[in-house]
């Protein structure tokens, strides 16, 4: 195989709780992860030169060893002693630095793509172990679907599929440092923790409204005071028909779960006209 086309899908957190902090600075979490339909397009092609060439539609995105796709390719080349190089055409649609694991999903696709291009037949479980070396979300981005993530996010338990629902995604024009958010969380007196087990139970019942009502993200207690526009977008979504709305990951992206496509599109138009979020996308839950 000389070339492969891949779709790197975004994720949202239906629930995100932080259990504690490790001595190495990492945090133990419990998260309910869900893949959505929004995706980046990736084309990977083998080339004879010993190079990794990345082309992207985002001008400020690094295309060197600071890019997670580059890191994933280099990891596979070194691990399995692969000759030749790779050219990558990365067409991004997932908002950057948005709490939606866009970079991690791109890296997951790069691992998967290298496995296919070089016909390595590396088991998925082994790819997921390699993924942790790139980032905590990469193993989940290989698994996709509905899952409980524990540890630093790498311990995954497959959950029943989240029922189909309409999801509106809105990213305000601010970039959030995940590292900063977690550092500030250590000094924040968090009084309200999301009911992760309750969210899982609602998913098992296939009750979208119940899932939405139980959604919660402990990181909102840090990010929203820093960027109040996040709370404004949440309120706008709920006032315009969302069953509930929440920040994904460390932010700043907000997603809302809607009962129907019509109300979702109406809210999208409102948010675009208001102008607090430049990137507003309609999507849906994705089941692999």
Curated annotation (Swiss-Prot):
The keyword Transferase applies. It comes from the Bacteria. GO terms for biological process: isopentenyl diphosphate biosynthetic process, methylerythritol 4-phosphate pathway; terpenoid biosynthetic process. Its EC number is 2.7.1.148. One of its GO terms (molecular function) is ATP binding. Keywords: ATP-binding, Isoprene biosynthesis, Kinase, Nucleotide-binding, Transferase. NCBIfam families: ispE. This is 4-diphosphocytidyl-2-C-methyl-D-erythritol kinase. It comes from Lachnospira eligens (strain ATCC 27750 / DSM 3376 / VPI C15-48 / C15-B4). The gene is ispE.
């Amino acid at each position: 195989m000389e070339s492969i086309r891949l779709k790197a899908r975004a994720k949202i957190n239906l629930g995100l709780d932080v259990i504690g902090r490790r001595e190495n600075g990492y945090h133990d979490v419990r998260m309910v992860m869900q893949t959505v339909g929004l995706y980046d397009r990736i084309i990977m092609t083998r080339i004879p030169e010993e190079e990794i060439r990345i082309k992207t539609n985002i001008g400020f995105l690094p295309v060197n060893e600071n890019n997670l796709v580059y890191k994933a390719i280099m990891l596979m080349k070194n691990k399995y002693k692969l000759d030749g190089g790779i050219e990558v055409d990365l067409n991004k649609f997932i908002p950057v630095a948005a709490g939606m694991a866009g970079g991690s999903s791109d890296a997951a696709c790069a691992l998967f793509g290298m496995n296919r291009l070089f016909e390595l037949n590396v088991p998925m479980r082994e790819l997921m172990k390699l993924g942790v070396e790139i980032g905590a979300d990469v193993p989940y981005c290989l698994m996709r679907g509905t899952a409980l993530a524990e540890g630093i996010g790498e311990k995954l338990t497959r959950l029943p599929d989240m029922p189909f629902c309409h999801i509106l995604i809105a990213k305000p024009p601010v970039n959030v440092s995940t590292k900063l958010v977690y550092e500030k969380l250590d000094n924040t007196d968090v009084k309200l923790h999301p009911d992760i087990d309750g969210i899982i139970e609602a998913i098992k019942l296939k009750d979208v409204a119940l899932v939405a009502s139980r959604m919660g993200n402990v990181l909102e207690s840090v990010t929203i005071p820093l960027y109040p526009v996040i709370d404004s977008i949440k309120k706008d979504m709920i006032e315009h028909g969302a069953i509930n709305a929440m920040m994904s990951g460390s932010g700043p992206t907000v997603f809302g779960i809607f009962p129907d496509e019509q109300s979702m599109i109406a809210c999208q138009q409102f948010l675009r006209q208001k102008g607090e979020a430049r990137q507003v996308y309609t999507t849906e839950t994705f089941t692999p």
